[in-house]
Curated annotation (Swiss-Prot):
<dbReference type="GO" id="GO:0005829">
    <property type="term" value="C:cytosol"/>
</dbReference>
<dbReference type="GO" id="GO:0000967">
    <property type="term" value="P:rRNA 5'-end processing"/>
</dbReference>
<comment type="similarity">
    <text>Belongs to the YqgF nuclease family.</text>
</comment>
<dbReference type="InterPro" id="IPR006641">
    <property type="entry name" value="YqgF/RNaseH-like_dom"/>
</dbReference>
<keyword id="KW-0690">Ribosome biogenesis</keyword>
<dbReference type="InterPro" id="IPR005227">
    <property type="entry name" value="YqgF"/>
</dbReference>
<keyword id="KW-0963">Cytoplasm</keyword>
<dbReference type="InterPro" id="IPR012337">
    <property type="entry name" value="RNaseH-like_sf"/>
</dbReference>
<comment type="function">
    <text>Could be a nuclease involved in processing of the 5'-end of pre-16S rRNA.</text>
</comment>
<keyword id="KW-0378">Hydrolase</keyword>
<dbReference type="GO" id="GO:0004518">
    <property type="term" value="F:nuclease activity"/>
</dbReference>
<dbReference type="InterPro" id="IPR037027">
    <property type="entry name" value="YqgF/RNaseH-like_dom_sf"/>
</dbReference>
<dbReference type="Pfam" id="PF03652">
    <property type="entry name" value="RuvX"/>
</dbReference>
<keyword id="KW-0540">Nuclease</keyword>
<protein>
    <recommendedName>
        <fullName>Putative pre-16S rRNA nuclease</fullName>
        <ecNumber>3.1.-.-</ecNumber>
    </recommendedName>
</protein>
């Protein structure tokens, strides 16, 4: 059983994968997307799904602090609907409030990574945190 975590943004999708037993999450990569050109990285996602034999997706929902939904929540749900349709794999959603903030804090405090380098890995780490939170709550 492998679960893939996704942090869906307007320009990138951070990707993480669980271990086969569903205990830990590991960041994999960042897929570049272009919403204007309707390029959502599904070809690369298909390669990863096949490689890791994914049987569930977890997508972060970027809710507002007052628990309301904004346009990014709708975009994340639309992305989830599309991958469920394309891959016939169930999609779950995980509240991702503050995961990007937590990821940035971790990169600054624990790894002392410069701002430029943080931008290159932050979405992957956010996907890892989203997936780990899901695993901790559900397994």
């Amino acid at each position: 059983m492998r679960i893939m975590g996704l942090d869906v943004g307007s320009k990138t999708v951070g990707v993480a994968i669980s271990d086969p037993l569903g205990f830990t999450a590991q960041g994999l990569e960042i897929i570049r997307i272009n919403e204007d050109k309707q390029d959502f990285g599904f070809d690369r996602l298909a390669e990863l799904v096949k490689q890791y034999q994914v049987d569930r997706f977890v997508i972060g929902l970027p809710k507002n602090m007052n628990n309301t939904s904004g346009p990014r929540v709708e975009a994340s749900k639309a992305y989830g609907d599309k991958i469920e349709e394309l891959f016939h794999i169930p999609v779950s959603y995980q509240d991702e409030r503050l995961t990007t903030v937590e990821a940035e804090r971790m990169l600054i405090e624990q790894a002392d990574i410069s701002r430029g380098k943080r931008k290159k890995v932050i979405d992957k780490l956010a996907a890892q945190l989203i997936l780990q939170n899901y695993l901790d709550c559900n397994y």
